[in-house]
Amino acid sequence: AIHLKGVKNGSKVLEIKCPDWKKFGRPKSGRGNGQTLLGMPRFDNGQFTSRFPFAEIVLQDQDIPIDIRITGWSPFIPTDADNSGLPVGALEYTFTNTSDEAVEAVFYYGANNNFMSANHKTAAASILPTATGFILTQEAVPDGREPWVEGHFAIFTGDPATVVNHCWFRSVWFDPLTFAWRDISEGKLTSNPPSNDAKAASLAVPLKLGRGESKTVKVHLAWYVPSSGNHIGGDARNDRDRGPCYDPADYEGIPYYYKPWYASRFEGINDVIAYWRAHYDDLRKKSELFAEAFHASTLPPEVTEAVAANLSILKSPTVMRQHDGRLWCWEGNNDSSGSCHGTCTHVWNYVQALPHLFPDMERTLRETEFMVDQDSRGHQTFRANLPIRPVEHGFHAACDGQFGGIVKAYRDWRISGDTEWIKRLYPLIKSSIDYCIRTWDPKEKGVIEE
């Protein structure tokens, strides 16, 4: 939100006005829509544009003599999978004074501790301090059960003038929001210390802008959720299922539940914060370089937009990277869950962006297909387990996915030039081809007919 001192109607949420159908067409809207903030004052006009991996919103309002540009992004640097998979994001708020006089304002950014769960009364939830910001956190359950309840989300700026309110007014119903909005509408810089029972926090950045002057406030976001409750798929039932590459030593000590790759790279949220602070400018520069090159294409804008829209899937929860760096993917996502597990080969068979932008990640999919999900017959199970481990082979193979894996192995070798890699896979590729011929072309006509 923004507050302009001495300006009538000068306090507004940094969003455009909500359409009436969103305010009044929802269940329980007659009671004020709870904590949605849909009734708060917002900007009259807004425009959204996308230059993947950057999104931009421009806000304007007749009451506010400031133009506001919000730029959202997270690192996306082709061939650099590690930095492109960081658990971070950024919102850059640029304020430009369009009046003939100097203006004073305060920028606010607040959040509830959404990690706090009433169902886990033994998990300690709190809001912790970090330089020029705060950390929403919930610790793991002491007995080690349900590790997925642990989570940490940091919100901070790079502005030393930032004032942090670590603890909103503690009450029920709408009281916390009421008091928070009172502070905003009065331009207060409230600085409450951390408290163990805090449920929401905010930061405030005072601004002084001369005529025509601009200033950018960079809100850094970082998170760390080291475990999950995801253990998916049926395990191999016998040596045939486990296949020729199986070595029990490869699976000693692997986590029972999915553990994200970044939790192996970073010790905790403070490590992520430190890395994001130290490398912010460089990661932005490299991401901007990709955006400039991509959007400078002479392809029709409709094509560029379509490709960019699909590239965004690589930055979504559809694509997961487990503790050892290998990719595992859903077919897509629901609002709060994955849809159809296992990097399904007859869905992911048609992906083209990943092998060309992040070829090392694409090759991990070939390794899973041939070295983990292929049994001693050459049969491939087209859905991989999570965490990745030998899978049962009680269902039919998917011919498009299995044929496609063979073709893609050749493509991936052409892209990478890694001959040792293709040599390691070749016996398994040959076994897969033999299985395909026996199963779908038993008369050896070169045509799928079974």
Predicted regions and their residues:
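Beta-strand-rich N-terminal accessory domains
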Residues: 1-27, 297, 307-310, 315-317, ...
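Active-site-surrounding "flap" and adjacent substrate/cofactor-binding loops of secreted or lumenal enzymes
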Residues: 2-22, 239-270, 371-379
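Extended, loop-rich substrate-binding clefts of extracytoplasmic carbohydrate-active enzymes
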Residues: 24-88, 169-203
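Extracellular structured ligand-interaction cores
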Residues: 52-54, 86-92, 102-106, 112, ...
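Short, hydrophobic/aromatic-enriched beta-strand segments in well-ordered soluble domains
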Residues: 59, 70-74, 107-111, 213-225
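Ser/Thr/Pro-rich, low-complexity mucin-like regions
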Residues: 66, 95-99, 103, 211-213, ...
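Polysaccharide-binding surfaces and accessory modules of carbohydrate-active proteins
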Residues: 70, 75-182, 186, 203, ...
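Substrate-binding groove/exosite segments of carbohydrate-active enzymes
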Residues: 185-200, 206, 213, 217-218, ...
